[in-house]
Amino acid sequence: MKLLKVSRERRQTLYFLAISRGIPAITVMREIDVSRIVAGGLQRSMTAITIKAISEALRQFPQLNAMIRFGSDSTLICPDNISTRVTLEKVLNGVSGVYSRVISNTDRLSVADIERALQQFKQEDAATSEHYEKIRLIQRLPPLLAGLLLRLAMLSPTRQAETWGSFTMTSLGKNSPDACIPISGSTFTFTLGLINEKLSRNSHDVAMSHVANLSMIFDHRVLDGRLASEFLAQIKSNMEGFALESSS
C-alpha cells in the first residue's frame, strides 16, 4: 500500500467541493420526451437545447435567478442577467480534470449561439487558454493558501455570481448514465441522462419515443419543493415543445 497526493491538476475540484459542501441540496427528476429533437437530428445540440430551455424557464420564474451569498444563510444575490455555468473535462499535463466556463445572457441567445460557445469551450487548451489562467495559478499554490484565496474571492457578490452563474449544466457525454446527481455549487445544477428508446401508448396506437432523465439539484435555502417542481415542469414543457426552427 502507498499514499499519494491528489494531482495538482485536479485540486480546483477539491477546493470547489469544499465551498459547496454546506449547501442543503435537494434533487428532483423528470423524464423528458426528446423525440422531436431526435427526429430533427439535433442530438448533438442537446446540451445547448437544454440550456436554452432552462434559461427561458428561469425568465418565467425571475425570483429563482438568485443565490445565497457566500458566508450567509439569509442574504440573496440577484444577478442582472441569466447566465449558465458549464463544466468540461480537460486534460492538463496528462491529467484529466473538471474545468468550467460561464455563458452570459443564455435566455437571449439562440440555440446555435449557445452551441457555438460550447464548441469553443471544448477547443480551448487548459494549458494555454487565458480563461484558465487563474485555475492554473490555484493549482500551483499550496492547498491551504489556494483554498483561502478562493473563499476570500467568494466574499464578493459580483465574483460569486460570475463564478457560479444562474445555474450549472453538466454533461457526461455519450457515455452518460441514465441519471446523475452531482454535488451542486450553484443554486441549480442540471444533468441530462442518456437518451433511451421507450414504447409509448395512447388511445390510438403504440409508438417508439426517445426519452431522457433531467435531474435538477437545487439549494433548499432559495426555494421549496413545490416551486422547484413547477420550475422543472416548465423546463420539461420548454424542451418537449422545442421549435426546431429556433436552432438556426
Which residues fall in each region the model found?
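C-terminal catalytic/motor cores of large multi-domain enzyme assemblies
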Residues: 1-248
